[in-house]
Structures are given as structure tokens and as C-alpha cells.
Amino acid sequence: MNGGHIQLIIGPMFSGKSTELIRRVRRYQIAQYKCVTIKYSNDNRYGTGLWTHDKNNFAALEVTKLCDVLEAITDFSVIGIDEGQFFPDIVEFCERMANEGKIVIVAALDGTFQRRPFNNILNLIPLSEMVVKLTAVCMKCFKEASFSKRLGTETEIEIIGGNDMYQSVCRKCYIDS
């Protein structure tokens, strides 16, 4: 793919979205592209930078709104964004960056723990040149898992946690529990 475009990596928790994002950014680095990654600053589960659930770390700018980094990223040609569902301006930002010739790679949940869409990610799909939906392993029956299930009783959408608060589950296990 030449020129600006958007790559969207979606799926449930524990499906390897952040790992795939890092893999793609590293490939562009090997190909001599100037790359930057951005993560949601309220996600501080493991420390600074972008972290995978298996504790791999990658340097990243940390913000709550993508428009806050517009000046800092002008010299970069590849922009990786983790936890895209939490950025309120993800659609406008990605469209602007791709239109300016930048490669934008977004990793995001496609649905909430209630299996409802993150509308900003849903709105990004028709603007993306590439969309990949990953699956995880069901933490109950070990089959393919397409959903994230919260273990607690909280009802707020934005509660950031790992396997202490969420499980990846298949359709049957989601419904049965």
C-alpha cells in the first residue's frame, strides 16, 4: 500500500491486538519509515509506554485526545494507536492523518463487555483500507472467543483492567454465565 491509509485491528480483549500493532510498527521501522505510537494515558496498568498483556513494552506518546499530539507527530509517516476505542477524536484524527499521506494503524476493541459497539470504531471501519478482526481463546471452554466479559458488576464502559477484571469468551460461554 502506497500513500496514506488506515489499518484497523479489532477484536476482544486478549486477542493480540496490541501485539499485532507493535509487530506492524516494527516492520515499518525495519523498512526505514519514521514511526510513532500513541496510547491512551488513562491506561496505566503496567507503567509508561504501550504494553501487551504478556508484558512486552513499546515506547509511546500518552494522551487522552489525539488532537493533542498533532504538532508532535508531523515528522512521522507511520502512526500506531493502541486502545483506539477510548479516543473521542479517533475518526477525525485518522481520516486527517491518512489524507495527509500517513499510514495509521489502530488497535481497538470492537465491542464493550455488554457486546455493544464502540461507535467511534464502528465509524472508522468504512474509512479504513484494511480491517482485521482477531479472536482470542475462550477462558472457560478454550474455543475461539470473540467477546470480552467483565468479571465484576460495574456498569461503566471505561474501566481499564486485565485478566483480573475481564475474560475473553465464546458466544456460548458469554450467554451461559
UniProtKB/Swiss-Prot annotation:
EC number: 2.7.1.21
Chain residues that bind substrate: F113, I157, E158, I159, I160, G161
Catalytic activity: thymidine + ATP = dTMP + ADP + H(+)
Active site, UniProt feature: E83 (proton acceptor)
Protein's name in the database: Thymidine kinase
Chain residues that bind ATP: G11, P12, M13, F14, S15, G16, K17, S18
Alphabetized UniProt keyword annotations: ATP-binding, Disulfide bond, DNA synthesis, Kinase, Metal-binding, Nucleotide-binding, Transferase, Zinc
GO biological process entries: DNA biosynthetic process; thymidine metabolic process
Pfam family name, one: TK
GO molecular function terms listed in the Swiss-Prot or TrEMBL record: ATP binding; metal ion binding; thymidine kinase activity
Function: Phosphorylates thymidine and thymidine analogs, such as azidothymidine (AZT). Part of the salvage pathway for pyrimidine deoxyribonucleotide synthesis.
InterPro entries in UniProt: P-loop_NTPase, Thymidine_kinase, Thymidine_kinase_CS
Organism in which the protein naturally occurs: Monkeypox virus
Binding of Zn(2+), residues: C138, C141, C170, C173
UniProt gene name: OPG101
Quaternary structure and interacting proteins, as annotated: Homotetramer. Two molecules of substrate bind to each enzyme tetramer.
Family: Belongs to the thymidine kinase family.
